[in-house]
């Protein structure tokens, strides 16, 4: 998308191009890494690069991932929530709509299951951590696959998904077990069987320290370019920064965005792109 993540690609590149065009040689080396697969767990992207060429990176590096931000450019992301994507496949018995007693309606069972899981999660895991925006764990039913193509058929299979972004101190295994309990209750009451799969499961690595050199470098550059005080924060979204952090490499996520990623009419503003390039140039120069 134009914001997610072409804006970060272009702004980081043009910050470096400005130095080259002006004949400025920085005091330290600068590297840009462009990786694939970020939306699908980075198995063929940064994860592969870190495994195959981990020698490219050092804990002393200033690692910036331009993949999240705020409209005023003052949010520096230093932490991400744990998370998992859950898939529920509900099996019942298909039949004609005129004789529902001969079938087991998986859509009705799925609706009950979604409501039960949603209510349980959002009333059990209510802690807040003001480092993060939003400050609570989020548990959202999202995708629903098509079942029967016509109105007069009772569906015998339904598939739906949850997207869960969980504050780091919670135990994902415990949450998974409680979800299974809700599944078992609804299955016993409705006669369906349920296959519960993990599409992905990521425990949050340790946050990048607030006083790390990369955070301080961004704070100085943002103050110079925007005359604003930046602040370290956490987000619910996932970026490739977590893979750096898992390797003990302190990374910061930063850009100036209106948070239109994955939305209809996703956009980035040219003034933001130019300002971000200026911030990157200041960081490259060690200012």
Question: Where do the language-model regions lie?
Answer:
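Acidic/histidine-rich catalytic neighborhood of metal-dependent amide-processing enzymes
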Residues: 3-79
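Metal-dependent amide/peptide-bond hydrolase catalytic core
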Residues: 68-73, 78, 84-287
């Amino acid at each position: 998308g134009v914001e997610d993540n072409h804006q970060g690609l272009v702004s980081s590149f043009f910050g470096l191009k400005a130095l080259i065009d002006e004949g400025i040689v920085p005091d330290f080396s600068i590297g840009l890494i462009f990786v694939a697969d970020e939306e699908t767990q980075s198995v063929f992207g940064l994860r592969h690069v870190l495994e195959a060429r981990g020698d490219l990176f050092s804990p002393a590096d200033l690692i910036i991932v331009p993949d999240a931000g705020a409209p005023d450019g003052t949010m520096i992301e230093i932490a991400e929530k744990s998370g998992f994507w859950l898939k529920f496949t509900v099996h019942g018995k298909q039949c004609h709509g005129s004789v529902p007693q001969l079938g087991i309606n998986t859509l009705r069972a799925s609706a009950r299951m979604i409501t039960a899981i949603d209510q349980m999660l959002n009333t059990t895991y209510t802690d807040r951590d003001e480092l993060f925006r939003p400050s609570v764990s989020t548990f959202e039913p999202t995708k629903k696959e098509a079942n029967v193509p016509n109105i007069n058929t009772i569906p015998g299979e339904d598939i739906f998904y949850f997207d869960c972004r969980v504050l780091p101190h919670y135990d994902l295994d415990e949450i998974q077990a409680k979800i299974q309990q809700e599944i078992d209750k609804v299955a016993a009451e409705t006669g369906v069987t349920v296959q519960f799969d993990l599409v992905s499961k990521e425990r949050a690595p340790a946050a990048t320290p607030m006083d790390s050199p990369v955070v301080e470098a961004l704070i100085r550059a943002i103050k110079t370019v925007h005359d604003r005080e930046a602040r370290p924060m956490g987000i619910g979204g996932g970026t490739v920064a977590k893979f750096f952090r898992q390797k003990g490499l302190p990374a910061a996520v930063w850009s100036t965005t209106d948070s239109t990623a994955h939305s209809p009419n996703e956009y980035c503003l040219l003034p933001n792109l130019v300002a971000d390039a200026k911030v990157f140039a200041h960081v490259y120069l060690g200012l």
